[in-house]
Amino acid sequence: MVSAILALGIAFAPVALAGSGFRSKVLRMVNATRNNHDLHMLRIDRSLSRDALRHTRRMIADNAIYDPTNLTRILQDEPWDQVGASAVGCADTLYALHHAFMHEPVHRDILLNPKLRRIGIGVLEVDSQNTCGRNWLWATELFYG
């Protein structure tokens, strides 16, 4: 069973644990999916990953899942010229999160956009009760091409 939340929440979640391994695992899943669809692999953008992590922290503090309202500002210093996009959500595993993105048409279209070149990834595990669930992963993925 795959569990994920890609919508708004209501409760409070004060504590989050970061894991540097989350970013590389998400990147591997995204690139494996893109490879399976004959698309080029994305490269990690460290500054964009910092922005993604900042947005994830903001969502956790607000205990709500939402796209960044300032995506244009976030991307203003990046070399993007064709597309800028975001995917946000939470799930009990990284696989469940990726699975949910791939089965939701808007997020799937983003992940499989052939014009994308770079990705920023911010994932945190929240160890307290919250809208998504105790020990669930909250994530922001930012893209440009």
Regions found by a protein language model. Name each.
Residues 2-11:
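Bacterial N-terminal signal peptides
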Residues 14-18:
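Sec/Tat signal peptide C-region and signal peptidase I cleavage site
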Residues 19-62:
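A short alpha-helix/helix-coil micro-patch that ends at or immediately precedes a cysteine
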Residues 36-50, 63-74, 108-123:
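Surface-exposed patches in mature extracellular/periplasmic domains of secreted proteins
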Residues 37, 60, 82-83, 106, ...:
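Residue-level signal for pocket-adjacent positions within structured domains
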Residues 49-99, 111:
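Short, surface-exposed glycine/acidic/tryptophan-bearing loops
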Residues 90-145:
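Disulfide-stabilized extracellular recognition modules
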